[in-house]
């Protein structure tokens, strides 16, 4: 089993993701520069948070054209696992690997705080060790985290059980007040139709040690590792 963390110019959460896979998941992991095109030795890749290409034009819009992204698409099409965190989620949407888009936060300013998300499904490689309805405390840090999609896309996501995380209160209730950025239907994370691609705006890699305020994100990575182990 081997993980890769893709590094774009402007990525700043790549070392956090590397640390989690190495220390808390206990698996080999490499940094993958955005100009690389060979992902054949990896079982799962992570597109980390940050500001790829300075978020010029809009978040993820330039990164989608990096040489590595054609390989990421083929990687996902082959059934292997792709996790996009924050800026990584934005890039996955821009690249067409996930539906919808991430736009400016409702209040038009950068948000950096701990929030709560509810696990909406345990039927995914990233949540199969979590229980549906479980509440996780995970930080967010973004200016463009407002998830939008049209009515048909939302209906499809709901029908196919592809909404993986939703913003919630600490007791798990879904409210407008718990929605930090205006995301439609309080959506915090979604997966692809094949369920092997996940994008989420919260930062689980920053919630893997109690010293940092929460270890709730650790089981997301451990779920993925268990799924990869069963697949290889």
Report the location of each language-model feature.
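Active-site metal-binding loops of divalent metal-dependent hydrolases
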Residues: 50-51, 88, 143, 204
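Amide-donor transfer/coupling interface in amidating biosynthetic enzymes
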Residues: 73-77, 102-232
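Short, flexible active-site-adjacent loop segments at beta-strand->alpha-helix junctions, enriched
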Residues: 88-89, 123
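N-terminal beta1-alpha1 cap of cysteine-dependent amidohydrolase-like domains
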Residues: 1-85, 93-99, 105-111, 118, ...
């Amino acid at each position: 089993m081997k993980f890769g963390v893709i590094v774009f110019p402007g990525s700043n959460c790549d070392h956090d993701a590397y640390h989690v896979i190495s220390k808390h998941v206990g698996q080999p992991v490499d940094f993958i520069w955005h100009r690389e095109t060979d992902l054949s030795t990896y079982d799962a890749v992570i597109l980390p948070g940050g500001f790829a290409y300075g978020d010029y034009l809009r978040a993820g819009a330039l990164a989608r054209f990096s040489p590595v992204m054609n390989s990421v698409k083929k990687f996902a099409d082959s059934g292997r696992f792709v996790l996009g965190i924050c800026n990584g989620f934005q890039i996955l949407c821009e690249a067409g690997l996930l539906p919808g888009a991430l736009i400016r936060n409702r209040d038009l300013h950068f948000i950096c705080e701990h929030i709560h998300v509810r696990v909406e499904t345990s039927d995914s490689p990233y949540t199969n060790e979590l229980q549906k309805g479980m509440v996780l405390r995970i930080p967010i840090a973004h200016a463009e985290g407002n998830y939008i999609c049209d009515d048909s896309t939302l209906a499809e996501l709901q029908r196919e059980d592809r909404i993986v995380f939703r913003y919630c209160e600490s007791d798990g209730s879904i409210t407008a007040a718990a929605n930090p950025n205006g995301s439609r239907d309080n959506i915090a994370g979604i997966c692809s139709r094949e369920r092997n691609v996940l994008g989420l705006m919260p930062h689980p890699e920053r919630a893997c040690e109690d010293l940092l305020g929460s270890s709730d994100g650790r089981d997301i990575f451990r779920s993925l590792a268990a799924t990869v182990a069963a697949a290889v």
